[in-house]
């Protein structure tokens, strides 16, 4: 029996993520020893910006993936799509470089102003170094999306794992006498994140160069379609980032370094659960996109029934294992640092993962069929609620309040709206098809 391609892709993602998670866990111990609790807190705040810089392609990666999937479903060539996406992204990256050089003193002061052991110049240098590395890393997103659309997502999963391995090797060889914490933080960023940037650029060149001989690749309609659809994905991604990526920004303004490090360790631990399911959704995206192009929406309902249940089981089982091993995990990652996993936070992180399984599935369904309007309607409200509720919760109740605010933003908005919108959209498409017949 032939194993479905999306299962192979998901399995490769799980394997590579296990490698990456192990490396991230091991790096916590190295970085805590190298930088101390305060220095590592700075490293985690800066590292949280990776998700923001992945938005630097303005949604072109997701748009390109969908367009390639549609063409593959109709047995059409797509070299012009790849080259058009690369041409479109060049001025975008030039703009980001200018913004980084101009705004780094102000952004670094906002993010790192609470870390008094760094002066303004040191904060700005740390931010600029990290920003240029993360911006370069985002270039690889184009190649990864192409491989996913070609049902070769296992390549996109292996490369980040390889980057993590190389980054860990560099980090382990980094000497430090603790005399200059700012330089230690910068060199740690270099060691840990530059491999991902390097492999990302190489991957994109590998996919693009063979297509350069394509004639008439600069089609205005193709370019317009990519940018138009990419704009929708970009808007949604920005709003999603305002929901999911503001936690470290809020904590940098409201909580002490110790709470920030505790949150970082727990989020990485529970993040393994999220990635297991997210990898499955990523591998299913092109499958759903092709099914949508053929109006086979019964496939969506099969996926809904099978994989949401699977996600719930994974969350419950993994959370129980984390509860049993909580002391062991802390002793391995931060020996002698007196950190611990409160039961209240374990319960909240577990419930949050259940909510994410539910909402992320329907978000992927809607994006795979190119229906982003329900996301545009709901996510802005969620973004406002997420930031404000996390801030109020963190100020009044610490980490527990921050997580409660994040979860509440999902329950009030997208957890019910996205399933309703997906079913309504499919019913409308099916009805229109019947009328045409």
Curated annotation (Swiss-Prot):
Gene name of this polypeptide: rfbX
One GO CC annotation: plasma membrane
Domain of life: Bacteria
Locations listed in the record: Cell inner membrane
Biological processes per GO annotation: O antigen biosynthetic process
Pathway linked to the protein: Bacterial outer membrane biogenesis; LPS O-antigen biosynthesis
Native species: Yersinia pseudotuberculosis
Transmembrane segments: 3-23, 41-61, 81-101, 129-149, 152-172, 185-205, 231-251, 269-289, 310-330, 332-352, 375-395, 398-418
Disulphide linkage map: none
Keywords: Cell inner membrane, Cell membrane, Lipopolysaccharide biosynthesis, Membrane, Transmembrane, Transmembrane helix, Transport
Coarse class of the protein's main subcellular location: membrane
The UniProt record lists the keyword Membrane: yes
Topology in membrane: Multi-pass membrane protein
Descriptive protein name: Putative O-antigen export protein
Function according to Swiss-Prot or TrEMBL: May be involved in the translocation process of the nascent O-polysaccharide molecules and/or its ligation to lipid A core units.
Keyword Lipid metabolism: no
């Amino acid at each position: 029996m032939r194993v479905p391609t999306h299962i192979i892709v998901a399995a490769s993602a799980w394997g590579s993520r296990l490698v990456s998670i192990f490396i991230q866990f091991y790096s916590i111990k190295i970085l805590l020893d190298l930088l101390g609790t305060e220095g590592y807190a700075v490293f985690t705040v800066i590292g949280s910006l990776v998700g923001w810089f992945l938005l630097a392609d303005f949604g072109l990666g997701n748009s390109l993936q969908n367009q390639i999937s549609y063409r593959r479903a109709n047995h059409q060539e797509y070299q012009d799509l790849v080259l058009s996406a690369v041409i479109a992204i060049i001025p975008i990256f030039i703009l980001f470089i200018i913004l980084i050089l101009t705004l780094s003193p102000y952004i670094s002061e906002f993010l790192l102003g609470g870390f008094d052991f760094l002066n303004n110049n040191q904060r700005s240098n740390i931010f600029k170094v990290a920003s240029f590395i993360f911006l370069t890393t985002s270039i690889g997103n184009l190649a990864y999306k192409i491989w996913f659309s070609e049902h070769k997502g296992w390549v996109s999963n292996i490369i980040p794992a390889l980057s993590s391995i190389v980054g860990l090797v560099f980090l382990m060889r980094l000497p430090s006498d603790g005399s200059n914490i700012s330089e230690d933080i910068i060199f740690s960023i270099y060691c840990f994140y530059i491999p991902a940037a390097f492999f990302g650029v190489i991957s994109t060149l590998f996919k693009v160069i063979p297509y350069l001989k394509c004639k008439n690749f600069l089609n205005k309609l193709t370019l317009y379609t990519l940018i138009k659809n990419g704009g929708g994905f970009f808007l949604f991604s920005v709003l999603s980032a305002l929901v999911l990526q503001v936690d470290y920004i809020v904590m940098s303004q409201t909580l002490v370094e110790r709470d920030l490090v505790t949150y970082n360790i727990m989020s990485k631990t529970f993040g393994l659960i999220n990635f297991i399911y997210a990898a499955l959704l990523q591998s299913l995206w092109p499958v759903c996109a092709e099914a949508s192009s053929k109006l086979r929406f019964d496939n969506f309902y099969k996926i809904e029934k099978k994989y949401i249940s699977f996600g719930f089981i994974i969350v419950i089982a993994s959370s129980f294992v984390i509860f049993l091993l909580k002391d062991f995990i802390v002793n391995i990652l931060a020996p002698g640092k007196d950190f611990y996993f409160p039961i209240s936070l374990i319960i909240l992180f577990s419930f949050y993962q259940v909510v994410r399984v539910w909402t992320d599935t329907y978000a992927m369904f809607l994006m795979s069929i190119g229906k982003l309007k329900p996301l545009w309607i709901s996510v802005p409200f969620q973004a406002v609620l997420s930031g404000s509720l996390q801030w109020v919760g963190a100020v009044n109740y610490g980490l527990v309040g921050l997580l409660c605010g994040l979860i509440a933003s999902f329950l009030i908005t997208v957890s019910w709206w996205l399933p309703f919108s997906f079913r309504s959209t499919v019913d409308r498409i099916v009805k229109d098809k019947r009328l045409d017949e």
